[in-house]
Curated annotation (Swiss-Prot):
A Gene Ontology biological process term: translation
Name of the encoding gene: gatC
Protein's UniProt name: Aspartyl/glutamyl-tRNA(Asn/Gln) amidotransferase subunit C
Organism of origin: Streptomyces griseus subsp. griseus (strain JCM 4626 / CBS 651.72 / NBRC 13350 / KCC S-0626 / ISP 5235)
Keywords: ATP-binding, Ligase, Nucleotide-binding, Protein biosynthesis
Lineage: Bacteria, Bacillati, Actinomycetota, Actinomycetes, Kitasatosporales
Region (Disordered): 75-98
């Protein structure tokens, strides 16, 4: 597998709007080669008999089921409110809307 060239790193840097100096181009070229090599090794391991997954554990929606339970009446909920209007909490206006 041919390595990443300085020109390719410079092109990627331009696309990312990064300004890299000459020694940085060499440094990042080596790092990108290492990353591409690691991805290639993972690709070799990921065989046809290993299904692609988005999560390592087979968990789906581990939340409890909804159930109706007794709760406060509107009057009880509003009993401690400093201000209320039409069975709702009344709060100071924070936006400039009427």
């Amino acid at each position: 597998m041919p390595g990443i060239t300085r020109e390719e790193v410079a092109h990627l840097a331009r696309l990312a709007r990064l300004e890299l100096k000459g020694e940085e181009l060499d440094h990042f070229a080596g790092q990108l080669d290492d990353i591409i090599g690691a991805v290639a090794r993972v690709s070799e391991v990921a065989d046809q008999d290993v299904p692609p997954t988005s999560h390592p554990l087979p968990l789906t929606n581990v939340m409890r089921a909804d159930e109706v339970r007794p709760s406060l009446t509107p009057a009880q909920a509003l009993s401690g409110a400093p201000a209320q209007e039409q069975q709702r909490f009344k709060v100071p206006q924070i936006l400039g809307e009427d």
